[in-house]
Structures are given as structure tokens and as C-alpha cells.
UniProtKB/Swiss-Prot annotation:
Transmembrane segments annotated in the record for this chain: 15-35, 54-74, 91-111, 119-139, 162-182, 201-221
Gene label: dram1
Chief place where the protein resides: membrane
Species of origin: Xenopus laevis (African clawed frog)
Swiss-Prot/TrEMBL GO biological process terms: apoptotic process; autophagy; regulation of autophagy
Membrane topology term: Multi-pass membrane protein
Name of the protein in its database record: DNA damage-regulated autophagy modulator protein 1
UniProt-annotated location(s): Lysosome membrane
InterPro entries: DRAM/TMEM150_Autophagy_Mod, Frag1/DRAM/Sfk1
Domain of life: Eukaryota
The family this protein is said to belong to: Belongs to the DRAM/TMEM150 family.
């Protein structure tokens, strides 16, 4: 009997969620044990700023970005095929959703490459791209899910996706605003520090959005189970 999370192409969102979650948790555990960040809700990027955890963070987030892009492209192809049998979606809508999602993956690559304290402006720009494009992507995918219901999705799945999307959307605003209000960047936050309440609120929202993405991709597993991925290789005779 095959594992339900490995049937068809379901391994893609499954590995994405497992790998991304492990990347966050591994860098958090290492940074806390070494004493680089306080254990109570640091920023995700703070846990991957100092070596050796910075290497773990950068590598795992880079792989997550590639897995995310592969998952989004496969999702795009699935929707394209589904739309052939029942015309429930304009073609451009699926393309726009994919473009936004891939742009978010590029943002993840920027976050992984440019560390928070080394190049803060570039790192912050990458993080902003990741979170904003990520939220836009899952909101669009939730809308698409409702359009394809009940043929390709259950009503319950649509509701779950939209709920996760709205929570992420609500959280991304205070995450950005309170990050600015918290003041200068630092790793050793203490409750007595000026701006700490803003920092704490922003960090909680950041973790909420990040794991909201993971929860959302979990809902793709059922859709991917009935799909197979094939690589076709052709050798041109005139080469």
C-alpha cells in the first residue's frame, strides 16, 4: 500500500511542507541552543543570521524556493488540464497566479542569499516580496478552488483554503507595520527593550504567515495524488 502523501505527484507538496518546516525549526533550535537569539518568538530570519545556523537556513530556504516553484508550476499544469474539460477559469488568470507565485519564490531565494544583518535592505525587500506574493498567490488559488468546485474540489477544501488565506492576509499587514515601528534591527531582544511589543507582534504574525503557507500547500496533496509527472526526451535527427 502506497503512502498517501507519495501517491502520484503528491510527493511535491509533501516534501515542500516537510522541508520548509524543518528549515525553520532546525535553524531556530540551533540559534537558541547556541544563544544567538532568545527562545521566545524571534523573527524567522533572526534564527538564520549568525553562523553556523545561517548556513543551514540559507541552504534549506533555497531548496524550499525551488520546491515551491516546482509545486506551483505543477499546480498550474493541473489547473490547465482541468480547465480543458470544464471551462471554469480564464486562461490568463491561471498564468497570473503562477507568475505571482514564482516571484514569491524568487523573494525566498533573495532571503536565503542575503543575510539580515549583512545586507538588510536587500534581505527585507526579498522578505516583503516573499510574503506579499505568497499571500496573493494563495488568495488567488482559493478563488480558483471555488470556481472549480464541486467538480475538482470539495466545498470543505475551498473553505479551509480561504480561511488559511484570510488569516495570512490579516497577519501580513501588522507583520510589516510593526516591524517598522519596532525600530532598529537587533537579535538580542528583551521585554524591557523599547519597541519590544511591536517586535513581538510582528514576529508572531511572521510565523503565522509562514506556517500558513505550509498548511495551505498541504491542501494540494489530494489534488496532486491523481497526477503523474513525466519527463520527455527527444533527440533531434539534424543535430
Amino acid at each position: 500500500m502506497h503512502c498517501w502523501c507519495l501517491q502520484g505527484a503528491a510527493f511535491l507538496p509533501s516534501i515542500l511542507v516537510i522541508w520548509s518546516s524543518a528549515g525553520f525549526l532546525f535553524s531556530y533550535i540551533i540559534s537558541v541552543l547556541i544563544g544567538h537569539v532568545p527562545p521566545f518568538v524571534p523573527y524567522i530570519s533572526d534564527t538564520g543570521t549568525s553562523p553556523p545556523e545561517s548556513g543551514v537556513f540559507g541552504f534549506m530556504i533555497s531548496v524550499s524556493a525551488m520546491l515551491g516553484a516546482a509545486t506551483m508550476y505543477t499546480r498550474y499544469m493541473i489547473l490547465e488540464r482541468q480547465n480543458l474539460s470544464i471551462d471554469f477559469l480564464p486562461i490568463y488568470f491561471n498564468k497570473i497566479s503562477l507568475a505571482i507565485g514564482l516571484f514569491g519564490c524568487i523573494g525566498m531565494g533573495i532571503v536565503a542569499t542575503f543575510q539580515e544583518m549583512a545586507v538588510p535592505a536587500v534581505h527585507d525587500a526579498g522578505a516583503l516580496i516573499t510574503f506579499i506574493c505568497g499571500v496573493m498567490y494563495i488568495l488567488l488559488q482559493s478563488y480558483i478552488s471555488y470556481k472549480s468546485c464541486p467538480t475538482w474540489n470539495t466545498r470543505a477544501t475551498c473553505h479551509i483554503r480561504m480561511t488559511v488565506s484570510l488569516i495570512a492576509f490579516i497577519a501580513v499587514v501588522p507583520m510589516s507595520v510593526f516591524s517598522i515601528l519596532s525600530g532598529r534591527k537587533r537579535l538580542d531582544w528583551k521585554p524591557s527593550d523599547e519597541g519590544y511589543p511591536y517586535h513581538l507582534t510582528s514576529a508572531i504574525c511572521e510565523w503565522t504567515v509562514a506556517f500558513g503557507f505550509n498548511m495551505y500547500f498541504l491542501t494540494f496533496i489530494r489534488d496532486f495524488q491523481g497526477v503523474s509527472i513525466q519527463i520527455s526526451t527527444e533527440i533531434h535527427e539534424d543535430f
